[in-house]
Amino acid sequence: MDKTVLDANLDPLKGKTIGVIGYGNQGRVQATIMRENGLNVIVGNVKDKYYELAKKEGFEVYEIDEAVRRSDVALLLIPDEVMKEVYEKKIAPVLQGKKEFVLDFASGYNVAFGLIRPPKSVDTIMVAPRMVGEGIMDLHKQGKGYPVLLGVKQDASGKAWDYAKAIAKGIGAIPGGIAVISSFEEEALLDLMSEHTWVPILFGAIKACYDIAVKEYGVSPEAALLEFYASGELAEIARLIAEEGIFNQMVHHSTTSQYGTLTRMFKYYDVVRRIVENEAKYIWDGSFAKEWSLEQQAGYPVFYRLWELATQSEMAKAEKELYKLLGRKVKND
């Protein structure tokens, strides 16, 4: 099988009822695009504002268990941390009576680490967008696709890969984007590696730069924030990396910048690599999944403590004042 898919056929989904479970960030966008592509879509959600929004936007909306009962294909588009409980209470009992069913996940996490184990009779697939819902809709309106990872954990029907590719087309990823053949385990590893390594390293480096510049060198908070990220330069660099490549985009910077970046990248590489190796092992052997499950069971004490520590830091307070001055929207205000 080719490792990349640039287009697919919607035929496996035609004549079937597709239940989108969760009408949040991904659910709303995927349901809307599939409906535009002529597929029969219903929505399953708890009775909250998203339930009412789905009704307002013209979908048939049901409680989650009823939506699964009425569906031939279900897309689970709810947060990882609540999915296990929702699956066990609302979905698993319904699946016991299904002879042929397709269960699609947008994340590999729960299946990869054994938190959810669908019946052997169920096609268990993954279509994992590499983009948030808002970004997907922006691209869709421009007639463009976006990247997704595809995986199959169980192929009860012999057609699981066909279903995965068809969903990728149905939700607008292809054509125009790219679907990469992957696995639940691979997606979970890559997703968590980003969240555990370069993202916190970047955030930590920015905070350290701010603290040292302001406290030890007398730099104004405004100047520090604008230099490190608030000006938008960091976002522009990220855009160029996505479009041109991480090293190719360096030609847009001065030679001084290029030299400083390259010399320090190789200088710190061994230290960073050891961090990444340790985190990858911790993820792959299931240790993080256990840590996160215990944190949830305890009521998120570490999470809330660290969130408060971050948002009450001097950098966060200075950022809030600067963004107000610049007329930017400040959330949680």
Curated annotation (Swiss-Prot):
Enzyme Commission designation: 1.1.1.86
Reactions catalysed: (2R)-2,3-dihydroxy-3-methylbutanoate + NADP(+) = (2S)-2-acetolactate + NADPH + H(+); (2R,3R)-2,3-dihydroxy-3-methylpentanoate + NADP(+) = (S)-2-ethyl-2-hydroxy-3-oxobutanoate + NADPH + H(+)
KARI C-terminal knotted domain segment(s): 183-329
Key words, A-Z: Amino-acid biosynthesis, Branched-chain amino acid biosynthesis, NADP, Oxidoreductase
Residue span(s) of domain KARI N-terminal Rossmann: 1-182
Top-rank taxon, per record: Archaea
One Pfam entry name: KARI_N
Disulfide-linked positions: none
Family: Belongs to the ketol-acid reductoisomerase family.
Protein name as catalogued: Putative ketol-acid reductoisomerase 2
